[in-house]
Amino acid sequence: MNQPLHYQSATEIASQIIRRKRSAWDVLEHFLARVEKYNPALNALIWMDTAGARQTADDADAALDKGQVWGPLHGVPMTIKESYEVAGSPTTWGSPEFRNNVTDTDAVSVQRLKKAGVNLFGKANVPLMLADWQTYNEIYGTTNNPWDLSRTPGGSSGGSAAALAAGLTGLDAG
């Protein structure tokens, strides 16, 4: 049985991109359309770099035109928990004290994911200091469960869980 693109594994998505069954651009646009449609009710993703992700998708497709594969996750659209340092993005851990903290470096894990070929396009909501059973903080508000908006998707990685469950991303590190 063929699953919709947004519920396929990251390795399945990468394989389709690498084998030129889908372009990195089209895959990214699929996920961005889902974010636009579903994220307003979920508040799972709280920061996005759409322009940067589109450029990376173009670069991923151009690399394949030259026979270059970036890694096993070539072109896969990915989001990541807000607490990870991603250059140019807020990293607050949901704490108002760090509201204006924008990091200028990538965490080692982010560097390694990018080396594997991912297209990191957004960050997912977290509870205050990553330490609650639900996902709420004063900066970004509440993340809702995609299957029942009156419920929580859980705590520390709730934004990541909601984004994956709703098919807003091909991969997430929470």
What is each stretch, according to the model?
Residues 1-55:
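An N-terminal boundary/leader segment
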Residues 13-17, 60, 160:
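Generic hydrophobic alpha-helical segments
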Residues 22-23, 69, 169:
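Conserved hydrophobic residue
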Residues 61-84, 118, 123-125:
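Glycine-rich, aromatic-flanked loop segments that form ligand/cofactor-binding clefts
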Residues 105-174:
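Short glycine/serine-rich loop segments
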Residues 50-73, 99-103, 113, 133-153:
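Flexible, acidic active-site loops/lids enriched in D/E/S/T/G that coordinate Mg2+ and/or position polar
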Residues 72-109:
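Enzymes and membrane/adaptor proteins characterized by extended Gly/Ser/Thr/Asp/Glu-rich
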